[in-house]
């Protein structure tokens, strides 16, 4: 049996070139030529994360990448790249035109141009053959006129005349005509608004031969031209620059700390919803907080700057000196902080022992006691004088200007009236006086009223003892309505007693009620 041999197919580039037109290429051929195999996809995916350029990883030809293979240890060679560029023909530089030298002018010469007498020869016109009337033809002489222009030497004024040069044959006359000055141009620049494009209008003025007119030039500062060429730009610096610097605020304490960490730690430990906030004004919180918790003797020289624990017997329950510190079993050391108003706050964290289990564990709420210290006002600044002798200062003291004169007669006290000034300020003293009753008759009887024993009267004696009582007057403001400012409470019942009368006044309740009898008919 004859074995069948497998024929090798054509190369991949040839197969792709033939099947590309028909569009029926094999997947492996198409993916290999278009670099879309699995290896190419992995290379693109990994190349977006790490750099794999220049390694030649792919399904292409094994040429070692774009640079080829180099033997190990051999230096890499640098291949020349790029094309040589020849310089072009240099461009002519822009600049001023060539300056034509001008003849020097002698300052000693006169500025007046002398006039010369020119002789004009007679020109004879030869008419040729003489013919009759109507047959004679006049032929004028041909005159050649040539002008030469020299921009420097040919300078003519307002009164210049043409120069006539005649030859020897007196047949040809040459006129040397001077060039006419160009007409004067007036340049006027006008703009319309800040953003409008300026327009240049040139006005030509007509001048006569040998005359000149003034040149009027109007310059507008808003019109800007184009600068041709390189100009050096020099940066300008201010003569007296302002120095900028930052001022750092000095620390308020000798050992500054991080404000953020301190605020977070304080808020986490003292200011949370599980801690009761109690402000107190008990000064014992600053030095010895045990005085506000329990009764007892303590050493005043002992400074308790540590956490204190108080143990109590439940059978001997005693009230705390301060009600806010009741049932406190533990109180911490003092902590100093600063409030929003800038005051110093002394804080202590305590714990109450309100509940005790059978095992002996005490449970209670955490309490934050804080005391805000008052601010210390700054003392008034006192201007101190310089010690020793010094010059440059002079003080003028006028006692009449600085002192104030008060005349009590011209300016009386408005609080005292004339009637009050007549009153005797001395108090009367009747401690050693005797009551003497005299009468011109014998057997005269005097009736001295007595106070009933049932009346509760309070008698005020002005001269009690030998001391001096000073009474300060009080002013009471009465409004316009006539009512006093203090609340008025009437005294009920009111008991009236007149000690100077000789009769009694019965109360209406003491009278017997009379019954009205009606007669029946």
Swiss-Prot record:
- Is Disulfide bond set as a keyword in this record? yes
Identify the residue span(s) of motif Nuclear localization signal: 1-10, 512-518
Which cysteine pairs are covalently linked by disulfides here?
Answer: 19-25
Question: Any keyword Disulfide bond?
Answer: yes
Species name for this entry? Human papillomavirus 4
Oligomer status and interactors? Interacts with major capsid protein L1. Interacts with E2; this interaction inhibits E2 transcriptional activity but not the DNA replication function E2. Interacts with host GADD45GIP1. Interacts with host HSPA8; this interaction is required for L2 nuclear translocation. Interacts with host importins KPNB2 and KPNB3. Forms a complex with importin alpha2-beta1 heterodimers via interaction with the importin alpha2 adapter. Interacts with host DYNLT1; this interaction is essential for virus intracellular transport during entry.
Q: InterPro entries of this UniProt entry?
A: Late_L2 (IPR000784)
Its BP terms in the Gene Ontology are: microtubule-dependent intracellular transport of viral material towards nucleus; symbiont entry into host cell; viral penetration into host nucleus
Q: Which domain of life is it from?
A: Viruses
Q: What is this protein called?
A: Minor capsid protein L2
Modification after translation: Highly phosphorylated.
User: Which Gene Ontology molecular function entries are recorded, alphabetically?
Assistant: DNA binding; structural molecule activity
Q: Output the Gene Ontology cellular-component terms.
A: host cell; host cell endosome; host cell Golgi apparatus; host cell nucleus; viral capsid
- Similarity comment: Belongs to the papillomaviridae L2 protein family.
Q: What role is this protein assigned?
A: Minor protein of the capsid that localizes along the inner surface of the virion, within the central cavities beneath the L1 pentamers. Plays a role in capsid stabilization through interaction with the major capsid protein L1. Once the virion enters the host cell, L2 escorts the genomic DNA into the nucleus by promoting escape from the endosomal compartments and traffic through the host Golgi network.
Q: Which UniProt keywords apply?
A: Capsid protein, Cytoplasmic inwards viral transport, Disulfide bond, DNA-binding, Host endosome, Host Golgi apparatus, Host nucleus, Host-virus interaction, Late protein, Microtubular inwards viral transport, Phosphoprotein, Viral penetration into host nucleus, Virion, Virus entry into host cell
Compartment(s) where it occurs, according to its Swiss-Prot or TrEMBL record:
Virion; Host nucleus; Host early endosome; Host Golgi apparatus
């Amino acid at each position: 049996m004859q074995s069948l041999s497998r024929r090798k197919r054509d190369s991949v580039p040839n197969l792709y070139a033939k099947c590309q037109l028909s569009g029926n290429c094999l997947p492996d051929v198409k993916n290999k030529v278009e670099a879309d195999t699995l290896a190419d996809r992995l290379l693109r995916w990994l190349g977006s994360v790490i750099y794999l350029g220049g390694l030649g990883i792919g399904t292409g030809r094994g040429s070692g990448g774009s640079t080829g293979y180099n033997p190990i240890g051999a230096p890499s060679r640098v291949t020349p790249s790029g094309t040589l560029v020849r310089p072009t023909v240099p461009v002519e530089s822009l600049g001023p035109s060539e300056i034509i030298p001008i003849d020097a002018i002698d300052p000693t010469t006169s500025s007046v141009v002398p006039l010369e007498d020119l002789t004009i020869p007679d020109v004879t016109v030869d008419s040729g053959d003489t013919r009759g009337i109507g047959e004679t033809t006049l032929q004028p002489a041909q005159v050649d006129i040539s002008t030469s222009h020299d921009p420097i030497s040919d300078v003519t004024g307002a009164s210049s005349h043409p120069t006539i040069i005649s030859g020897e044959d007196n047949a040809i006359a040459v006129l040397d005509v001077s060039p006419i000055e160009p007409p004067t141009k007036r340049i006027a620049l006008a703009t319309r608004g800040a953003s409008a494009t300026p327009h240049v209008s040139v006005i030509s003025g007509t001048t006569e031969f040998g005359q000149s007119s003034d040149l009027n030039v109007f310059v507008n500062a808003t019109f800007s031209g184009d600068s041709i060429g390189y100009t050096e730009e020099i940066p300008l610096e201010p003569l007296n620059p302002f120095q900028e610097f930052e001022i750092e605020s000095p620390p308020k304490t000798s050992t500054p700390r991080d404000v953020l960490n301190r605020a977070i730690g304080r808020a986490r430990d003292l200011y949370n919803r599980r801690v009761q906030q109690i402000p107190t004004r008990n000064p014992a919180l600053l030095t010895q907080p045990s005085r506000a918790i329990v009764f007892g003797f303590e050493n005043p020289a002992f400074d308790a700057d540590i956490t204190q624990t108080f143990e109590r017997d439940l059978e001997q329950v005693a009230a705390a000196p301060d009600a806010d510190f009741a049932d406190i079993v533990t109180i911490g050391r003092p902590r100093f902080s600063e409030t929003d108003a800038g005051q110093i706050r002394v804080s202590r964290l305590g714990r109450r022992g309100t509940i005790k289990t059978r095992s002996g564990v005490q449970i209670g709420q955490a309490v934050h006691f804080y005391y805000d210290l008052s601010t210390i006002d700054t003392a008034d600044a006192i201007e101190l004088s310089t010690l020793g002798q010094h010059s440059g200062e002079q003080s003028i003291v006028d006692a009449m200007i600085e002192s104030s004169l008060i005349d009590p007669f011209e300016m009386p006290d408005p609080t005292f009236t004339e009637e009050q000034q007549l009153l005797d300020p001395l108090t009367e003293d009747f401690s050693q006086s005797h009551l003497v009753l005299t009468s011109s008759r014998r057997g005269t009887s005097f009736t001295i009223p007595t106070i009933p024993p049932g009346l509760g009267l309070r008698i005020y004696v002005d001269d009690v003892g030998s001391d001096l009582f000073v009474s300060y007057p009080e002013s009471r403001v009465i409004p316009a309505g006539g009512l006093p400012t203090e609340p008025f409470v009437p005294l009920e019942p009111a008991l009236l007693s007149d000690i100077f009368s000789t009769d009694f006044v019965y109360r209406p309740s003491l009278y017997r009620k009379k019954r009205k009898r009606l007669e029946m008919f």
